[in-house]
Amino acid sequence: MDQTVYLEVNASQKPAIELLQSMGYTYISPEDCEKQRGSKYHVLLKDILRGQLRKLNRYTYAGAVNEFSAGNIERAMDELDEPLTDGLVRTSEKVYDALLMGKSYPETVGNGKSLSFNLKYIDWDNWDNNLFHITEEYAVESQDKQHNARPDIVLFINGIPFAVIECKAPHISEEQAVEQMIRNQQADYIPQLFKYAQIVVATNKNAVKYATTGTPKKFWNVWKEENDTFLNAALATHITDRTPTEQDRNIVSLFSKERVKELVRYFVLFDANVKKICRYQQFFAINEITSGNK
């Protein structure tokens, strides 16, 4: 292993994974991920997703609570995997809408009648019902098999990849990670991963930028945590054997489970085929306004 790769792994990637595990994300090896994916082109962790769709979803008819049919569970998984024919951002919007609102599927009820019921991919109201995983070196292949990429860290909710982190050695600018992330989203690389991603992060331990799918380089932002009580308590809980880095502070700020819920549910938007995620100033200003109205 050359020195740059060694530093990337040991100064950035490994500490990030350890911190995320301490924050409640379950590590799953690349090999175990691949068994669930079906191929290196596909990116959903299907066994986890299937199990969560069964667990999270019931419909009520005539006072009886019922499970969705196995066929509808499979259909819901297939339909979440939207084709990229409309381009990455429009496809990402379709996926985002499904993650927020679910999809409706017909079930046969009494006397052979068919009624439609809503099926959810993420339980926004009972957040602890969801499963959170991380993996590393997530090998993904382009559709024509001419390109492949291996994002350093991918985060999942219920087997759905919602965030990607690209790590660099401390002496390599985080801008290189930004450029790599943007390249990987191009049509001839691995856009099928990024149609699910809501948060993307470029880090070299000492400097961090974040964005969302399709964000041009000039609009990648830095996050400055304004809730010092939250941040300091989390760092004290999860990092006990070293001095926290800028990367640590950003991981806590962006990927603490409750913060993920807020950012993804309320602070991602689509405007004229542009996908946006809030700047930190917007996040804290809106939270201050809404908390004052309670």
For each predicted feature, which ranges?
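ATP-dependent helicase/translocase motor core
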Residues: 2-11, 15-294
